[in-house]
């Protein structure tokens, strides 16, 4: 039988004080009386608490390496959903705090604050079942010791819905618990290379904290014609200059496209994000007249295929690429022409 790894796996006798049969018959030799003497006081709250691995006082050694009776720890650490260390150390677990294999103990405290829900297989004891009935937050086991328990990753998300909205709004400057909240630490301005300002009012930024460098906040410019006034934003179709968009595109700027003029941008349909221009040697001469006035193709239809694409289809369908025998008497062979034969 594997060593017991948490208080959940102990089987307690229904009568307190009556011993249970040992799990292996050879393991424990019970000598002396099997029942306590008459008049012995029954187990108090300390014994019941120790039996269920809930220490009454959380503190020092409870939260550090030694966890008495496999407890996750009381006090502040248990409130946020404590990391419980598994009590065995299989070799693949390394010296990892809260080992990866053995099921950890349950966190102390109410369920909505991360208590309960220990004892599962994959490095458990990391947080409890929240009010929605499943584990909401997985706490990473950083080597920071107690700071890993109390960071913002440990906070369990409250259940959405009615009880959040029916709660009266806290007074100004106070949190939901009533104590005054700490001033929020603003993100550094160095993360946002150009904080997006509302157009026309340079001092007033948007109602958002500056984003990180790689993912700026999405904003559609309304009245500015420059798509680079807000870098990284999606420009609106009517105000974007398509030549700037093509030249700034990471893929399309590689291809040699003729620059689209600003006048052609105004003729674009509103759904087209930019105008791709084909280089001059590939373009069909533009016919400005109506469809009936355009010159007809050889087949008599208005062929939508430009004439420079005609050789592509005929070339792919021809048999000239098929391998023929190199026979000089064969007129259809590759070297039938003597001048071509000399050239090769």
Swiss-Prot record:
- Keyword Nucleus recorded: yes
Query: Quick one: where's region Disordered?
Result: 1-44, 58-134, 158-188, 320-344
Compositional bias per record (Low complexity), positions renumbered to this chain: 77-88
Bias type Basic residues, positions: 179-188
What keywords is this UniProt entry annotated with?
A: Nucleus
Question: What biological-process terms (Gene Ontology) are attached?
Answer: negative regulation of TOR signaling; positive regulation of macroautophagy
Gly residues bias: start-end ranges: 101-131
User: Can you cite an annotated GO cellular component?
Assistant: nucleus
Q: Where in the cell is it found?
A: Nucleus
Listed under subunit, the entry gives: Interacts with isoform 1 and isoform 2.
Under what name is this protein listed?
A: Laforin, isoform 9
